[in-house]
Regions:
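Hydrophobic pocket/interface hotspot
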Residues: 21-22, 31, 56-58, 75, ...
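Glycine-rich portal/gate segments that line the openings of hydrophobic small-molecule binding cavities
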Residues: 42-85
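Beta-strand/loop substructures that line and gate deep hydrophobic ligand-binding cavities in soluble
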Residues: 83-128, 133
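Short, highly charged C-terminal tails/helix-capping segments
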Residues: 136-140
Length: 140
């Protein structure tokens, strides 16, 4: 991550062991069920080649069909049950850490802010997705 770039951090504690959290975070059949910031959005398709140099794409769309985009990038670091670093298509960096704490897993994401939307909006959106992830893991 670049020192001059604004870094946003979001995190949650999931009431599940790290191996379950890792699977639900990385397998496309789970990603499509939690990867949305609000109930009026969804991810109808996800692809994930989880290895350094591997690519991922999640198709994110408004349920009413009014807007959609591909959230995609390339993995830089993959340390099973510990860390995932990737570079987005616009060259921003993202770092994700998984830390098991007494049967729970602390999941922390740090990402470089983009220039278009306010920092608060970006943080709120990414946190909402992480909150959906927590709920999905804990109820499945």
């Amino acid at each position: 991550m670049q020192a001059s770039q604004t870094i946003i951090t979001v995190e949650t504690i999931v009431a599940a062991p790290v191996d379950k959290v890792w699977q639900y975070f990385t397998l496309p059949e789970h990603i499509i069920n939690w990867n949305n910031a609000s109930a009026d959005w969804h991810t109808p398709k996800a692809e994930n080649d989880l290895r350094p140099g591997g690519k991922f794409t999640s198709r994110m769309e408004a349920k009413n069909g009014s807007f959609g985009f591909d959230f995609s990038g390339v993995y830089d670091v993959v340390e099973v049950h510990k860390a995932i670093d990737y570079t987005l298509g616009d060259d921003r960096k993202v770092k994700i850490q998984f830390l098991e704490e007494g049967g729970n897993t602390k999941l922390t994401e740090q990402f470089e802010a983009e220039e278009t939307n306010p920092v608060e909006m970006q943080q709120t959106g990414w946190q909402a997705i992480l909150n959906n992830f927590k709920t999905y893991v804990e109820t499945h």
